[in-house]
């Protein structure tokens, strides 16, 4: 059991499967990682250089999870500031995309009433 980029990885798993447990690496990106490292190797066979390559690929082409969440929060705040329909629904804690709220969305309405 080892940690790469905060993800707990089992030593006997293939790199393709183990790398999908890291934030920001999905199935397609995992296949790219496997091809860059060369074939079907297991986590325990990785060298320090190969681990550094995985971390470099992870940070290179995509937005890390905290940046993504920050961007989503900024978008929501922008909707609220311009008082558009979606912003108002966010403020009220109600469904945004046309879902029925008369008999459904009870959980979100309970949070508002408290």
UniProtKB/Swiss-Prot annotation:
<dbReference type="GO" id="GO:0006412">
    <property type="term" value="P:translation"/>
</dbReference>
<dbReference type="InterPro" id="IPR018269">
    <property type="entry name" value="Ribosomal_uS13_CS"/>
</dbReference>
<dbReference type="GO" id="GO:0015935">
    <property type="term" value="C:small ribosomal subunit"/>
</dbReference>
<dbReference type="InterPro" id="IPR010979">
    <property type="entry name" value="Ribosomal_uS13-like_H2TH"/>
</dbReference>
<feature type="region of interest" description="Disordered">
    <location>
        <begin position="92"/>
        <end position="114"/>
    </location>
</feature>
<keyword id="KW-0496">Mitochondrion</keyword>
<dbReference type="GO" id="GO:0005739">
    <property type="term" value="C:mitochondrion"/>
</dbReference>
<protein>
    <recommendedName>
        <fullName>Small ribosomal subunit protein uS13m</fullName>
    </recommendedName>
</protein>
<dbReference type="InterPro" id="IPR027437">
    <property type="entry name" value="Rbsml_uS13_C"/>
</dbReference>
<keyword id="KW-0694">RNA-binding</keyword>
<dbReference type="Pfam" id="PF00416">
    <property type="entry name" value="Ribosomal_S13"/>
</dbReference>
<keyword id="KW-0699">rRNA-binding</keyword>
<comment type="subunit">
    <text>Part of the small ribosomal subunit.</text>
</comment>
<comment type="similarity">
    <text>Belongs to the universal ribosomal protein uS13 family.</text>
</comment>
<dbReference type="InterPro" id="IPR001892">
    <property type="entry name" value="Ribosomal_uS13"/>
</dbReference>
<keyword id="KW-0689">Ribosomal protein</keyword>
<dbReference type="GO" id="GO:0003735">
    <property type="term" value="F:structural constituent of ribosome"/>
</dbReference>
<keyword id="KW-0687">Ribonucleoprotein</keyword>
<comment type="function">
    <text>Located at the top of the head of the small subunit, it contacts several helices of the 18S rRNA.</text>
</comment>
<dbReference type="GO" id="GO:0019843">
    <property type="term" value="F:rRNA binding"/>
</dbReference>
